[in-house]
Amino acid sequence: LPQIAVPLHAPELAPGQWIQGPPVSIAFARGAVVLVDFWESTCVNCLRTLPYLKAWHERYAGRGLIIVGVHTPEWEFTADPEVVATAVRAEGIPYPVILDEGRGTWLRFANHYWPAHYLIDARGYLRYEHFGEGAYGETEEWIQRLLREAGDSAPMPGQLAPVRNEDRPGAVCYPATRETHLGFHRGKLLAPEGYRPGEEVRHRARPEGPAPAGMFSVRGLWLHEAEYLETREPGAELDLLCEASGVNLVLEPAGELEVELDGRPVPAGERGADIVERDGRTFAVWERARMVRLVDSPVFRQRHLVLRFPQPGVRAYAFSFSTCAIPT
């Protein structure tokens, strides 16, 4: 099994607010196996790993595994402890979670990714790391291996079955459109007006046809901020072309918007979990600031989305995309 070539003493967690306890210290956890999970409540890849983390907690917490969720925020609003606490409750996370607001733990681990998993053995050494989704079977093998090294001689359960079809053998993960940020700091707005940091800008017309993949266009009155674009009048529109099987958008605060996919309402077999149908039209509805699921399809292909915002004051941060599909 792949492993860290030269095991190193694991760094201690940096001071931070414990969203869910009890607090954990790497030093005082000697004798136990610790899995440190760097995650973010609006990160689609992080959210997709949670079913496995929760299952491992249920399977192995009584046998000496301690999972610690380190929430390192990507956005200013996800540094709010109450936002994180709400996400922890909504996702049903059962293990301790610390808010890494200043990225102290992120820097101590020299981490660069969401999600990232680090396994620490009973002696306090880093033994295994994995970045991104996947390798769930390999990670569970390492959990079992380190528990055995710590003295657990009882039979181990068989590996957890894949929780999604796209995690099973035979699924194909295609190159997809990269995460698309909307704010001026990292965004790629296709508009003759361009970005005007901190200003309200009226975008009068979209360019002919959809924007190239990875770029987007808007119409109506929008406020340009570093992390997000904010609607400033009813009826503002956002236009995106992407290649993906699933499409998500980080939005703040609670609200709703109309979604069209390829010039029509989102078909029933491709609707994300937050899409509802009303009078033959499809809308995304969300009850708190979070990642909103717009499209969820078993098929990977090019998609053209148009979003219409019925109210001002909605902040749109970034699109993320799922890429894995089941061959037909």
Predicted regions and their residues:
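Structural microenvironment flanking redox-active thiols in thiol-disulfide oxidoreductases
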Residues: 47-90, 101-105
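Non-globular targeting/processing and membrane-anchoring segments
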Residues: 1-24, 29, 137-328
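Non-catalytic, surface beta->alpha helical segment in thiol-disulfide oxidoreductase systems
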Residues: 111-113, 122-150
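Short loop/turn microsegments at loop-to-beta-strand junctions
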Residues: 34, 114-116, 254
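Loop/turn elements at helix/coil->beta-strand transitions in domains of secreted/extracellular proteins
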Residues: 30-34, 62-66, 93-95, 122
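Short, internal strand/loop/helix patches
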Residues: 84-120
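Short active-site neighborhood of thiol/selenol oxidoreductases, capturing the structured segment around
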Residues: 24-47, 53, 67
